[in-house]
Amino acid sequence: MKVHRLFPRFFHFNPLHSVFNLMSMADSSKISLAFPGRQLLGDKKVCVLAGDVGGTKANLAIFEATAGQINLVKTSTYHSGQYPSVIKIIQQFFQENPGYQPDRISLGVAGPVFEGHAEITNLPWIIDKKEIIAETGIQYISLINDLEATAYGLAGMEEKDFLVLHPGESGIRGNMAVLAPGTGLGEAGLFWDGQVHHPFATEGGHADFSCRSADDMELHDYLLKDFKVVSWESVIAGPAIFDIYNFLLQVKKRPENKQISRAFKSEDPSAVISEAAIAGTDHVCMEAMKYFVRYLGRECCNLILKMKATGGLFLAGGIPPKIIPLLKQPGFYENLLDCDRMQDLVKKVPVKLLLNDKAPMIGAGWYGAYYLSSK
């Protein structure tokens, strides 16, 4: 059985403290994540079934942990839409892996979590902590938002898991933020208390989209046909790419490329559009992605300002790693800095792209091992 050690060599572990230190985004100064239950483990070993449960897929994993080390020992991926509930996915995992007997379950879920109860934003699922206990017999269950799990997952990342989009200014400590466009749009913060960072969830992706130009207003009015409220998720999540493309055809009267339209019938339209934009083979696709990247830059700026995220912003989710060439073009950075009188602050903030798509699953594992122990 292959075991993956999730204890990068640049972590500095003091058994007397329940924090993990990792490399700063800008230089060799350190930032830290708080795990208050870790010191309570001592030499005890715990087995955690951890999961990242989203609208498209669910990544499940087994972690084994002591106070000094956490190991990833098994992973499986499932298509969420093919199952009626997360319980069925967990049961499928246990059927496929009968040799594991976890004593706790920790799930990062794509939706708001209240008192052990969560509704998946882009699936007709309700996840209930009590139901999981009843169905599995496992008493220690945690449900956290998937972006909060992503933030905790930073503890298990190495330098190779990041791509610097903007280096910012070195040596600045402070709050941090995570923004993740995928099936939906997730946002989270990490509060800096002067010693360690504490991740927390938000639902900022559902805040109102703000229009600045006539083009923005036209797109807003077009989207209102399908959305009661046009949110930031309406313009910078996966489905938004196809919506923006159709807006350009129907409202802006851009010429339709029949080859692109045929590809939509057998492939994910958003992927077709972004790939054509990167390749430079279709002008309408290129224009659609310019809209998308512009709005992504603006919302990154918004999140930095609202969190006062001087410690850095992590760009996560399924889409950014697939459009790296577009993020390296001037449009993203120009819109990142295009704010009201706070350009000097935003310019100092490091921005990194998180390349490891298992970060939410890993974060759920670390939370289950080292935070749930304090409950």
Role assignments for model-derived ranges:
Residues D27-D43, L143-M176:
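Conserved phosphate-binding catalytic cores of ATP/NTP-utilizing and phosphoryl-transfer enzymes
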Residues N122-L123, S142-A149, G168-G171, V178-P181, ...:
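Active-site nucleophile and cofactor-binding loops and adjacent substrate-binding regions
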Residues L6, F10-Q101, E218-K375:
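ATP-binding/phosphotransfer module of carbohydrate and carboxylate kinases, centering on a glycine-rich
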Residues L107-G111, P181-T183, T310-P320:
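Glycine-rich beta-strand-to-loop/alpha-helix junction loops that act as flexible
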Residues N97-L143, A151-D161, V178, K322-P325:
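Short beta-strand-loop/turn "lid" adjacent to the catalytic site in phosphate-handling enzymes
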Residues A58, P112-F114, G184-A188, D243, ...:
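Short, acidic Gly/Pro/Ser/Thr-rich loop/turn segments
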Residues D161-E233, G238, G331-L337, R341-Q343:
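Glycine-rich phosphate-binding loop of actin/hexokinase-like ATP-binding domains
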